[in-house]
Amino acid sequence: MTAWTLDRARHTYSVPYWSDGYFDIDGRGRLVARPHGDEGPAIALSDVVERARGMGHKLPLLVRFSDVLGHRLGKLQQAFAQAMRELDYRGGYTAVYPIKVNQHAGVAGELARVGAPVGEAPYTADFGLEAGSKPELMAVLALARPGSIVVCNGYKDREFIRLALMSRTLGLDTILVIEKPSEVGLIIEESRALGVAPVVGIRLRLASLGAGKWQNSGGDKAKFGLSPRQVLDAVDKLQAAGLGESVAMLHFHMGSQISNVRDIASGMREAVNYFVELSKRGCPIRLMDAGGGLGVDYEGTRSRSFCSINYGLDQYAYTLLQPLAEACAEHGLPQPRLITEAGRAMTAHHAVMVVNVSEVERAPEGRVGPAQPGEPAVIRHLREVQAELDVRPPVELFHEAQHHLAEGQTLFALGQLGVEQRAQLDDLFYAIAHAVRQRLSAEEKSHRPVLDELNERLVDKYFVNFSVFESIPDVWAIEQVFPIVPVERLDEEPTRRGVIADLTCDSDGRIDTYVESEALDASLPLHALKPGESYLLAIAMVGAYQETLGDIHNLFGDTDTVAVHLDGAGGYLLDTQRRGDTTDVMLDYVGYKLADLRARYRANVEAANLPEATSAEFLAALETGLTGYTYLSEEPLE
């Protein structure tokens, strides 16, 4: 057996493969963040949690490493600046952040603060913002840097359009993207009413689309965008209104988290044909917005799997720019500025959800007691299987044990076995299952199906103090994968395999797929709990979409949130970004009047005719419960 080392720990939890250099394991076996990548300072998650607790924060705790945002943005911009130099592409590039990915001020505001041009002219990579609704637009108008690009996507009414047009007079390069034909007339009318010339983008409904869980945002069945005929009609209508010069941008979206770079290349080639054709029709296209799609490798498998990608930033940039450069050269067209809306790639790595294990239910070990006179035949058959563990093929033995277990379960349901015999049935089966697993090998092809089944069945359940639906809703909604790593003890070999279940009263409140050793598995290597010690897990790469998609199932609310900022001297500062929701906040949200609740509590206590001291104690406990954190407390009751 290979000795446990830190490198084995890194490989077991696939840290080098999904983290892109932003996380590692230090010499003390602690998970550390590296906000500036491989070469930057390392911050132990356990230290952050300890300091946050000293500030009054509780688990579960969302930890933002704010410097990762700027670093990710810089890497994206540098990739495009390099591709522009290689292709001698002089149109420029803008990394636009679509704030729907994470609207929180600590994220969108931080990106807006650090977003600045990268590279030397004419190969400059800039930064802009995107809004897809009126509330998002109001945030963007306050965050955007003067002169920067603001892309307005989503369905629009007159107020949305008017606000966008007004922002142009305030010094922003705001583009109204036409998502449906009816918006053309509204833009014409509102621009005349305000006396402001619009800058218009047209969203193309491409036939090309990326495969995966997010593919419905592209292709012929897409919710947004114009068909070829609708594109031509929109251009004709704008030109007839004297606004032909306003058609400055083409926008398209092939899907989110595109795994295969070939899908990106196909979509870009199709969009470039639109660019050439509309330019020939007199549209002064100066911007090409390739939308989202740039994925991140949640799995660390570097593959075409839905939660992985088979390309890097440099290849992505080159794949988008090359067909555009070639088309401009072939047709003698001015090179447009390329825009992407790669919000997931900017934000996913920066946030980690730290959760504590509240309890572990060990997998049944099974036991073989002495045979009893008059045992049912089904139990005798299992004893016979158990006695032959060393002499018969393990797969054959397991299937036979399964048959007898199913037979016994049926007999119990019919009332022909007692509960003691039913328990004995399980004891024997699990003893056999553990012994069979010891004889199986992953190298033996015929063993793999049974080994996989046993690895799913013979696992511990780790009950964790958080809500899947609130903190990682895409696990439930689309079976997304997030890497999970113990915060400490990574210098110790994990001796258990476990699955994670949350606090909610819902069977979907669990995680079924785990990142392990550059692959996916149905369970995760974890450590046995030590008495008196907390066991913390880090759910990584939760910075994109999860916070605002989260719901309040079982009235579990937002968690405490802290932001880590490097201080430039090798240390870091820790800021409170948000105190988590308390019970009274959640009850108020669903319509309960807090004054009425308190009055009911008091009336019930008074009706119980308790001693005065006991009544006061009960009322104090009820008030504490009403105003406390919605998650489990680690603190003992006084």
Where are these regions (language model features)?
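Short, glycine-/Ser/Thr-/acidic-enriched flexible segments
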Residues: R30, D38, V68, N102-H104, ...
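Low-complexity, highly charged intrinsically disordered N-terminal segments
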Residues: D20, I25-Q103
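Charged, compositionally biased N-terminal leader segments and the immediate start
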Residues: M1-L31
